[in-house]
C-alpha cells in the first residue's frame, strides 16, 4: 500500500448514523478499553504526532472519529469502553452508538481491537471480542505497549491474551510498540487485504 501520509485528515466526529461520511471507502475501526492507546496507535501508524488527540485521562474520545487516510481508507477511532468514571447513562449511550456503527455500517471491513500487552484482557475486552466474532466481523487483535515488556516475556504475555480471549487458529494477533513502530508494515499488509 502506497500512502501519502501528508494527505490525512479528520473528516467528522459523529455520534449517529446520519452523520457518517459518505466516502465509499473501506473503514477500519479501532476498538479497545479506555487508555489502551488507540489514538497513539493511529498516530504512530500514520506517522503523525497529534492527528488523533491523545490524553492521559481515560474516556476522552466520546465520538466516532473518522480519519481519511489518503483517499484509500478510513480509520474510525471508537470511544473506549470500561472506564468506570463514565456514568451508566453515558456508557449506555456509547454502547448504542458503537453497536449501531459496528452492526449496520456496510463500509466497515475490519475491526482492530487493541489490548494492553502488560495485562490480562478484562471482561470488557472478552465481551467485545466475542461480540465481533458473533457478528462475523473480521478482527485483528493488536497488543499495545510491547516496549513495556521485556523481550523474552512478550510471547508469554501474548499467550495469556490468546487464552483469555479464546483465540482459535486462524484468529489474528500482533504485538506492537507505538514507540518503536515495530511490525507497522505487517499491520499495513494485513489491513491492505481488506481494501
From Swiss-Prot:
EngB-type G domain mapped to chain residues: 24-195
Species annotation: Staphylococcus epidermidis (strain ATCC 35984 / DSM 28319 / BCRC 17069 / CCUG 31568 / BM 3577 / RP62A)
Family: Belongs to the TRAFAC class TrmE-Era-EngA-EngB-Septin-like GTPase superfamily. EngB GTPase family.
Keywords, ordered alphabetically: Cell cycle, Cell division, GTP-binding, Magnesium, Metal-binding, Nucleotide-binding, Septation
Origin: domain of life: Bacteria
Protein name listed in UniProt: Probable GTP-binding protein EngB
Binding site for Mg(2+): 39, 61
Keyword Cell division among UniProt keywords: yes
Cofactors named for this entry: Mg(2+)
Classification via CDD domains: YihA_EngB (cd01876)
GO cellular component: cytosol
Pfam families (alphabetical): MMR_HSR1
Its biological purpose: Necessary for normal cell division and for the maintenance of normal septation.
Amino acid at each position: 500500500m502506497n500512502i501519502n501520509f501528508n494527505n490525512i485528515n479528520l473528516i467528522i466526529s459523529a455520534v449517529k448514523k446520519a452523520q457518517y461520511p459518505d466516502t465509499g471507502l473501506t473503514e477500519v475501526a479501532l476498538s479497545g478499553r479506555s487508555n489502551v492507546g488507540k489514538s497513539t496507535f493511529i498516530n504512530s501508524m500514520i506517522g503523525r504526532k497529534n492527528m488523533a488527540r491523545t490524553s492521559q485521562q481515560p474516556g476522552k474520545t466520546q465520538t466516532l472519529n473518522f480519519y481519511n487516510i489518503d483517499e484509500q481508507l478510513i480509520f474510525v477511532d471508537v470511544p473506549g469502553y470500561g472506564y468506570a468514571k463514565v456514568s451508566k447513562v453515558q456508557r449506555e449511550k456509547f454502547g448504542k452508538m458503537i453497536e449501531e456503527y459496528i452492526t449496520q455500517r456496510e463500509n466497515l471491513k475490519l475491526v482492530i481491537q487493541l489490548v494492553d500487552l502488560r495485562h490480562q484482557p478484562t471482561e470488557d475486552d472478552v465481551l467485545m471480542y466475542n461480540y465481533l466474532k458473533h457478528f462475523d466481523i473480521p478482527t485483528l487483535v493488536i497488543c499495545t505497549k510491547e516496549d513495556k515488556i521485556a523481550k523474552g516475556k512478550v510471547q508469554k504475555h501474548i499467550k495469556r491474551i490468546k487464552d483469555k480471549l479464546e483465540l482459535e487458529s486462524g484468529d489474528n494477533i500482533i504485538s506492537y510498540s507505538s514507540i518503536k513502530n515495530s511490525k507497522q508494515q505487517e499491520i499495513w499488509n494485513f489491513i491492505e487485504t481488506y481494501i
